[in-house]
């Protein structure tokens, strides 16, 4: 599966000057929602990501809301597991709402569309572990961490992508006067 081509085909690979959640600037942004809005593409991505973890016995798949809800669902479907999501708790962390089942000892896979620092998925992991879940792996459509994201369990992605990132003070796009878009 050519993941980068799917991003291009669906208009999910944006070019310009972007302020990332990490505070870094980048000439590219991967708008995964534009890809995952297409059920056939979403399902194909979910199946491919699920295959990377098919040997793990996974009870549920969790992702940070809102962006990860679709991804959690399609990966869980591929693995025959439950699909959960974690929401912001208003205190800088995440929580799993009542009604979503996590049994003590349940094995889970955490997924994210794009991992840059891994902080969002870490918050979802902490929410699941707080309910007794046991993390067995982390999956992503795209790893743009440059190998810096580590979770203490297998971390696998469909695509490792080196995308330039700059702190504001060293950003060539700022120096060129390219308008900054917050994403």
From Swiss-Prot:
<dbReference type="InterPro" id="IPR023031">
    <property type="entry name" value="OPRT"/>
</dbReference>
<feature type="binding site">
    <location>
        <position position="144"/>
    </location>
    <ligand>
        <name>orotate</name>
    </ligand>
</feature>
<feature type="binding site">
    <location>
        <begin position="112"/>
        <end position="120"/>
    </location>
    <ligand>
        <name>5-phospho-alpha-D-ribose 1-diphosphate</name>
    </ligand>
</feature>
<feature type="binding site">
    <location>
        <position position="21"/>
    </location>
    <ligand>
        <name>5-phospho-alpha-D-ribose 1-diphosphate</name>
    </ligand>
</feature>
<dbReference type="Pfam" id="PF00156">
    <property type="entry name" value="Pribosyltran"/>
</dbReference>
<dbReference type="GO" id="GO:0000287">
    <property type="term" value="F:magnesium ion binding"/>
</dbReference>
<feature type="binding site">
    <location>
        <position position="88"/>
    </location>
    <ligand>
        <name>5-phospho-alpha-D-ribose 1-diphosphate</name>
    </ligand>
</feature>
<keyword id="KW-0328">Glycosyltransferase</keyword>
<comment type="similarity">
    <text>Belongs to the purine/pyrimidine phosphoribosyltransferase family. PyrE subfamily.</text>
</comment>
<dbReference type="InterPro" id="IPR006273">
    <property type="entry name" value="Orotate_PRibTrfase_bac"/>
</dbReference>
<keyword id="KW-0665">Pyrimidine biosynthesis</keyword>
<keyword id="KW-0808">Transferase</keyword>
<dbReference type="GO" id="GO:0019856">
    <property type="term" value="P:pyrimidine nucleobase biosynthetic process"/>
</dbReference>
<comment type="function">
    <text>Catalyzes the transfer of a ribosyl phosphate group from 5-phosphoribose 1-diphosphate to orotate, leading to the formation of orotidine monophosphate (OMP).</text>
</comment>
<comment type="pathway">
    <text>Pyrimidine metabolism; UMP biosynthesis via de novo pathway; UMP from orotate: step 1/2.</text>
</comment>
<dbReference type="InterPro" id="IPR000836">
    <property type="entry name" value="PRibTrfase_dom"/>
</dbReference>
<dbReference type="InterPro" id="IPR029057">
    <property type="entry name" value="PRTase-like"/>
</dbReference>
<comment type="subunit">
    <text>Homodimer.</text>
</comment>
<dbReference type="GO" id="GO:0044205">
    <property type="term" value="P:'de novo' UMP biosynthetic process"/>
</dbReference>
<feature type="binding site">
    <location>
        <position position="116"/>
    </location>
    <ligand>
        <name>orotate</name>
    </ligand>
</feature>
<keyword id="KW-0460">Magnesium</keyword>
<dbReference type="GO" id="GO:0004588">
    <property type="term" value="F:orotate phosphoribosyltransferase activity"/>
</dbReference>
<protein>
    <recommendedName>
        <fullName>Orotate phosphoribosyltransferase</fullName>
        <ecNumber>2.4.2.10</ecNumber>
    </recommendedName>
</protein>
